């Protein structure tokens, strides 16, 4: 299954490049349309999609190939987030959140159909003084 978030991300990157290359207002407006098309598709994925989208964008912008979930996820959000990820082709993701109940959230991901593969090191959204992403440990999951 195609990763719909990656497809939207690529379209968003095209929109940004088109906007940066635009030489007049008409070309800028065309670039904006591309942006709105990418975002509109995400909006159609459901309530949890915007949360996933923000995390997906951040993950890709910092050089990660997979979605990294780093923000707080409440227990009751897990089934909907997992359903959205599965329905839209997220086969692998990492989880680097460090809040108090994060281990329970990781357990819930497994209960909802993702298998823990182990630890990996990823680029976080935080950067050092030189603009390099800081490396952080994360749990990697794949769909069953």
Residue spans of the language-model regions?
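An N-terminal amphipathic alpha-helical segment
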Residues: 1-101
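General "foldedness" signal
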Residues: 33, 107-109, 123
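Generic structural signal for short, flexible, solvent-exposed coil/loop and linker residues
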Residues: 82-84, 105, 130
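Ser/Thr- (and often Asn-) enriched beta-sheet segments in non-cytosolic proteins
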Residues: 92-96, 115, 140
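Short, aromatic/basic amphipathic alpha-helical patches
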Residues: 103-115
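C-terminal edge-of-domain segments
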Residues: 116-144
């Amino acid at each position: 299954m195609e990763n719909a978030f990656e497809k939207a991300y690529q379209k968003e990157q095209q929109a940004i490049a088109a906007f940066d290359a635009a030489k007049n207002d008409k070309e800028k407006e065309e670039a904006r349309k591309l942006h709105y098309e990418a975002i509109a598709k995400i909006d159609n994925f459901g309530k949890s999609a915007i949360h996933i989208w923000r995390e997906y964008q951040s993950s890709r912008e910092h050089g990660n190939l997979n979605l990294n979930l780093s923000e707080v996820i409440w227990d009751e959000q897990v089934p909907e987030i997992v359903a959205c990820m599965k329905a839209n082709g997220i086969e692998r993701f990492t989880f680097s959140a460090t809040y108090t109940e994060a281990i329970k959230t990781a357990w819930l991901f497994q209960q909802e159909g993702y298998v823990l593969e182990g630890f990996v090191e990823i680029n976080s959204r935080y950067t050092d003084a030189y603009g390099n992403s800081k490396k952080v440990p994360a749990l990697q999951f794949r769909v069953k």
